[in-house]
Structure formats: C-alpha cells, structure tokens
C-alpha cells in the first residue's frame, strides 16, 4: 500500500538521503537485519532495484525487486522473516533465485496498471481516497477513446516533467474499461510507461466524459505530442501496479 510512503524509491537531496518513509527504504532495512554481510560484500551494501518507480499513494500488487547477495537463502523461511519485520502495509509474496544477468527493471517485457474510480453521486464511509466521479460514466465511449492508444505511439502528451528517459515511445497492448457496480476500472498494459502517463490518460478520459467531448479528442491529444492538450493528472490513489512480466 503506497498511501503512507513518499513513493517506492529512496529520496535524495544534495546527495544525502532524505528522512522520509519509502518502500525501498523499508525493504533495505529489513534485508540488512536478515542478511549478515559476507566477506565479499563488506564494501557493497545491499541495494534493491525495482521494476519501476511508483509515486506517493500508488499501490502495488506486482512490484518486482532484485538484490545481490552471497548468502544462502531458504525462500519460505526468508519470506516469513521479512514479513515479520516489514510494516503491515508492505509484504513479500514470492522469492526466486535468478541468474546474474536478471535486472528487475531492464529485463521487464511488460507492465500492467489498473486505475480504480468510484462512479457514484454520494460518498460512502469506505470510499477512502479513491477518486469519485459524480456524473455517470459512459463505459462504451471511454473504451472507444482508449482504443486510439493501442499500438506503438509517442506518448509525449501524457508525460509529466519528471520523465527521465529521452524516448517517449511506448507500445500499449491492452487498454480496457470495466464497470463493476459503482466501480470503474481502467486497465492499461504495455512495454513501458512514462512518468504519470497512466494518471494523465485517466484524466483525459474524464475530461472527454465530463465535457462531453468527441471520443476522437483522445486521438488528437495523442498526436499533438503536447502535454498542454491532455487532461489533468488525476490522484495517485486508485492506481495499482498489478503485474510485471518478463
């Protein structure tokens, strides 16, 4: 759960680690507790590498992390011990020994994100921080608009200024809208995603719905390669990294 953390990655300022809770910070503290540094690791502290960066408030059910160690680890025992040390809102679900060539980020072939919306006029006690849309969403219109994003495109219109990779080209293999009761889920899967790309796509969908713009507006925004043409970047609450494929 990402609500109580300043994102997945340890934060630095002027070369020094900022004292703020992060998923990476909690994982590395737990690892240091469990793994006694061997002779070959004295000058190489345990460092975790994530499959991708998530912001404050973003949840993850499928985050993949790798680290190097020269110690022998028994998976079932290690998972139990890690989860005993970690805070209640972070857990390790699986552990595998991988080849030295494996890299959690660079070896990834696809990432699947899901954004959850509440489509209801009135709030309820257990809504939490999930974005609530008061007007009725037309799922068929939303799906047609999302279809313009399938395939390989330059997604510059949907990036935020924090995007570090110079390439803005992504290949989207899945873009679906699903409605279950008063919940609407946007499913997006692709080889890579730009910073805040999913949240801005959702914001553009809501702009199309809220202002009753033609569904072709999504195509125009995509082809403009201009962030100013897209909708707002919606709240991180409701966004979940569901799966990373290798």
Indicate where each model-derived feature is located.
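Structured-RNA-binding interfaces characteristic of tRNA pseudouridine synthases
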Residues: 2-246
């Amino acid at each position: 759960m990402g609500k109580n953390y300043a994102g997945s990655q340890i934060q630095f300022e002027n070369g020094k680690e900022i004292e703020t809770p992060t998923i990476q910070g909690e994982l590395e503290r737990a690892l240091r507790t469990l793994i006694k540094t061997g002779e070959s690791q004295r000058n190489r502290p345990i460092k975790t590498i994530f499959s991708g960066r998530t912001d404050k408030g973003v949840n993850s059910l499928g985050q993949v992390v790798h680290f190097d160690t020269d110690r022998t680890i028994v998976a079932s025992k290690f998972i139990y011990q890690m989860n005993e040390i970690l805070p209640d809102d972070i857990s390790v679900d699986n552990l595998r020994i991988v080849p030295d060539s494996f890299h959690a980020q660079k070896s990834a072939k696809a990432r699947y994100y899901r954004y959850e919306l509440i489509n209801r006029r009135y709030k309820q006690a257990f809504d939490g921080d999930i974005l609530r849309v008061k007007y009725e969403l037309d799922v068929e219109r939303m799906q047609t608009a999302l279809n313009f994003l399938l395939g390989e495109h330059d997604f510059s219109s949907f990036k935020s200024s924090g995007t570090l990779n110079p390439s803005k080209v992504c290949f989207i293999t899945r873009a679906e809208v699903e409605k279950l009761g008063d919940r609407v889920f946007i499913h997006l899967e692709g080889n890579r995603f730009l910073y805040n790309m999913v949240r801005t796509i959702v914001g553009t969908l809501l702009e199309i719905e809220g202002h009753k713009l033609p569904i072709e507006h999504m195509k125009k925004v995509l082809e403009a390669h201009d962030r100013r043409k897209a909708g707002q970047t919606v709240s991180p609450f409701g966004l979940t990294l569901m799966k990373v494929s290798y």
